[in-house]
Amino acid sequence: MQQSESSSAQFDVAVIGSGPGGYEAALHAARHGMKVCLVEKASLGGVCVNWGCIPTKALLRSAEVYDLAKNPSEFGVNVSELSFDLAQAVKRSRKVSLKSSKGVEFMLKKAKVEVWRGEAVLTGSKGVKVTAEDGSERSLEAANIIVATGAQPRVIPGLEPDGKKIITSREALILKDVPESMIVVGGGAIGVEMAWFYAKAGAKVTIVELMPRLLPAEEAEVSEALKRSFEKVDITVQCGAKLGNVAISEFGVNADLLAEGKEPQKIEASCMLVAVGVTGVIDGLGLDAAGIETERGFIRTDELCRTSASGIYAIGDVRGGMLLAHKASAEAAIAVEAIAGKLPEPLSEPLIPRCVYAQPSVASVGLTEEAAIAAGYKVLVGRSQFAASGKANAYGQLEGFVKLVFNAETGKMLGGHLIGHDAVELIGELGLACRYGVTAEGLVGTVHAHPTLSETVREAAFAALQSKG
């Protein structure tokens, strides 16, 4: 039954979507004493908790444990009859996701955020209609609305997913069996992580990336190191290439591989994972009714996450830019502070850390050397290999390095780039250094615990100082 306009529930803030941006916005607004409603049509936590960050990392951990167990004798451990159980890995992954989702539910309840289940449609700049799964409807009005609906996999014409032969990252998280072979279209973060997981699980994997290298937004040296590492474990990497004709049969997928300056080549696999980016979840949201402008599949906003409609904000993936959960969380705080009448500091995208969780893992923050030079900086660069680290040697994980980029004139850090086992865990220090302009001397003068991988950061800073002559 449709409620009348006069019976609409009243809130200070309504949040549409419960991913890292949405639930953080709701919690932050509640801490400000605002009456908050959060609307979610699926599981609390959004894609990140249920079909993205969290379950992916759980699967990657399973593959990492399996990989370590395949070579245990060096560590004095004897293992026999080793095998990889994908069903159990998926089961654990789903359990981890469910626990995280329940955690979000607990936090919202504790903060007295009212959660409405259903599909939200904007009915104006202040109104939202929510349709529950059973078809029942109710309405709310809010002084401010935050749209945090996230994003969904981009579909390429001719590569429409069928959930079996052509899949997205969502299906890749719950496959029943390890495919004999897999073509991964896209060498970004999702493609790289899924390629590594399924290769370690036993599939023969080929990555096809249109750009000249894997992780094209990252430091070139890091991308090349990752490619070499992947090729050592028999992952075929085809960069500067695209797919031509794609055919599906009962046996799998075959396609023409097209690379500039090379003859077309036939490739085939049991299935194909398409991971070529995402587009904002905006269809059916009622953006026109609210007067909200979009651009290339995302909601257009200013630096404080304000849309073209007064009182409506957009945060996270639906806003575009870097598609990262922690960026969404940071934008949640910005939007709520703006609603509260504060003057929040706009987010600087270069200072947002980027992480890729294959092994070796990749992490970066700030400018690459190339970008810094292009921006007009004179740079000072320092590098240090993890192979020189006592901790890395003790763990038998020698791959990778740290590369730091400094402003040669001021000495302040401009960017930090890492590749190595669990290198992502070091990015916090580098993010802090970039944000506050820490110098190479400052990093060297900071005592780093021994033995830790973080000592490699200090050694890279020391190398930069030595290069000054």
Swiss-Prot record:
GO terms for molecular function: dihydrolipoyl dehydrogenase (NADH) activity; flavin adenine dinucleotide binding. Its main location: cytoplasm. It comes from the Bacteria. The keyword Transferase does not apply. Its EC number is 1.8.1.4. It is an enzyme of class 1 (oxidoreductase). It is found in: Cytoplasm. Pfam families: Pyr_redox_2 (PF07992), Pyr_redox_dim (PF02852). Its cofactor is FAD. Signal peptide: none annotated. Coiled coil: none annotated. FAD binds at E40, K41, A42, S43, L44, G45, G46, V47, C48, K57, A120, D317, A325. NAD(+) binds at G186, G187, G188, A189, I190, E209, A275, V276, G277, V278. Homodimer. The active site is a redox-active disulfide bond. Lipoamide dehydrogenase is a component of the alpha-ketoacid dehydrogenase complexes. This is Dihydrolipoyl dehydrogenase. It comes from Chlorobaculum parvum (strain DSM 263 / NCIMB 8327).
